[in-house]
Swiss-Prot record:
It catalyses: UDP-N-acetyl-alpha-D-muramoyl-L-alanyl-gamma-D-glutamyl-meso-2,6-diaminopimeloyl-D-alanyl-D-alanine + di-trans,octa-cis-undecaprenyl phosphate = di-trans,octa-cis-undecaprenyl diphospho-N-acetyl-alpha-D-muramoyl-L-alanyl-D-glutamyl-meso-2,6-diaminopimeloyl-D-alanyl-D-alanine + UMP. Signal peptide: none annotated. Catalyzes the initial step of the lipid cycle reactions in the biosynthesis of the cell wall peptidoglycan: transfers peptidoglycan precursor phospho-MurNAc-pentapeptide from UDP-MurNAc-pentapeptide onto the lipid carrier undecaprenyl phosphate, yielding undecaprenyl-pyrophosphoryl-MurNAc-pentapeptide, known as lipid I. It comes from Porphyromonas gingivalis (strain ATCC 33277 / DSM 20709 / CIP 103683 / JCM 12257 / NCTC 11834 / 2561). Pathway: Cell wall biogenesis; peptidoglycan biosynthesis. This is Phospho-N-acetylmuramoyl-pentapeptide-transferase. It comes from the Bacteria. Belongs to the glycosyltransferase 4 family. MraY subfamily. Its cofactor is Mg(2+). Its main location: membrane.
Length: 419
């Protein structure tokens, strides 16, 4: 909104009005505004949640300090959502299809998570919204994102190709024509590009059509999987929040370089016109998560609940799909993914051993993975992995997972120059 106001003021030759044409300036304002909003309104929202007795119910899992969290206000994800949307609405161009997709993602998954938390708190159902309805919402969002990226004429890229001399890359050439494409960025392959349509045994228009169908299916899987993994990661104070902030910084960098033709050429990644506006959203995302961490760090004054965790995971997934970096998510979202996979592996192994031996066995002492480190070894739990033998304090687990996230974020950026 402010973009259009200052665009008008620039026509009136108001000094300084042109600043709002610079993405870097609007991004800086976005992160500061989001950070201030989260910290200022956060305290007020927490007080209202506490007065309304919207607190977390705790199931005793025998973890140190767990019962002290009982009654801590939940649904704090509202703080994150508000702190993302207000800077985005004020500073980004609202005629940009990518910004509209991110706003829809935030509102849709925020509503889904809010409904889940509402059922848990007010209807006293610990399981919350039935899992099938969560999946329907996530699959529906992934389908919408995939279809819009396919059908909207504004969603285009400029394909890149390497110019070689003596077997070495001399420069990267971008085709002048903007095209619809099912290509995505992936390291270690020619031109850092991978086309979904290339793996299909078709030719011509049929190949293009089925390439987009495959892309839509990938979008559904990515949104559903990453959103649920982020939800499972939200089990320790500050863990999901800090991890999301780290990921958000990398996504902001990717959005900026993907929309800057010289930087895209240097990194040999596809050029995506219009993606520069996503930098503003990403900085608002980072500011909101860091601001929320002010209250969510150990010992937490508020939990984000599914209102926040489902939204954070969905935002990350959709953002990556838009800038064609979904193939880098296994590295970038490593912490989220190992948390999610630990649950899947545990359930699969337990059911397999129960069917074969009549008694279910575990690989981890407890899942998601962060709980495994909270349990001491040889504590009466029949698990294949008993180490560490001493329980690790919650705050130390969180910081170590953040450090892993930072390392994986650095590796993700480095892959763009790997040939």
């Amino acid at each position: 909104m402010l973009y259009y106001l200052f665009d008008y003021l620039e026509k009136l030759q108001l000094p300084g009005a042109r600043l709002f044409h610079y993405v870097s300036f609007r991004s800086a304002v976005a992160i500061i505004l989001a950070l201030l909003l989260a910290t200022v309104i956060g305290n007020r929202i927490i007080e209202r949640l506490r007065k309304a007795q919207i607190g977390e119910t705790i199931r005793d899992l025998g973890l140190e300090g767990q019962l002290s969290k009982k009654g801590t206000p939940t649904m704090g994800g509202l703080i994150i959502i508000i702190s993302i949307l207000i800077p985005t609405l004020l500073l980004a161009r609202l005629d940009n299809v990518y910004i509209l997709l991110m706003i829809v993602t935030t509102l849709l998954l925020g509503s889904l998570g809010f409904l889940d938390d509402y059922i848990k708190v007010f209807r006293k159902k610990k399981e919350g919204l039935h899992g099938r309805y969560k999946i329907i919402g996530q699959v529906g969002l992934g389908f919408i994102i995939g279809i819009v990226l396919y059908m909207n004429p504004a969603v285009v890229i400029k394909e890149n190709s390497e110019v070689l001399r003596d077997g070495q890359v001399e420069r990267v050439h971008f085709n002048k024509q903007e095209v619809k494409s099912t290509k995505t960025t992936i390291p270690f392959v020619k031109n850092n590009n991978f086309d979904y349509a290339d793996i299909l045994p078709f030719e011509g228009k049929t190949k293009v059509l089925f390439g987009w169908i495959l892309f839509v299916c990938v979008a559904v899987v990515v949104v559903t999987f990453i959103s649920n993994c982020a939800n499972l990661t939200d089990g320790l104070d500050g863990l999901a929040t800090g991890s999301s902030a780290i990921i958000g910084v990398v996504l902001a960098i990717f959005a900026y370089v993907s929309s800057h033709i010289e930087m895209a050429s240097y990194l040999n990644i596809m050029f995506i016109p219009g993606a520069e506006e996503l930098t503003i959203f990403a900085f608002a995302f980072v500011g909101a998560t860091i601001g929320f961490l002010w209250y969510n760090a150990y010992p937490a004054q508020v939990f984000m609940g599914d209102t926040g965790s489902l939204t954070l995971g969905g935002i990350i997934a959709v953002f990556a799909l838009i800038i064609r970096k979904e193939m880098l998510l296994p590295i970038l979202c490593f912490v989220f993914i190992i948390e999610g996979l630990s649950v899947m592996i545990q359930v699969f192994y337990f059911k397999l051993t129960k069917r074969r031996t009549g008694e279910g066995r575990r690989i981890f002492k407890m899942t998601p993975l962060h709980h495994h480190f909270q349990k001491p070894g040889n504590a009466g739990i029949d698990a294949w992995l008993q180490k560490p033998m001493q329980a690790i304090p919650e705050s130390k687990i969180t910081v170590r997972f953040w450090l892993v996230g930072i390392i994986m974020a650095a590796i993700t950026i480095a892959t763009l120059k790997m040939r």
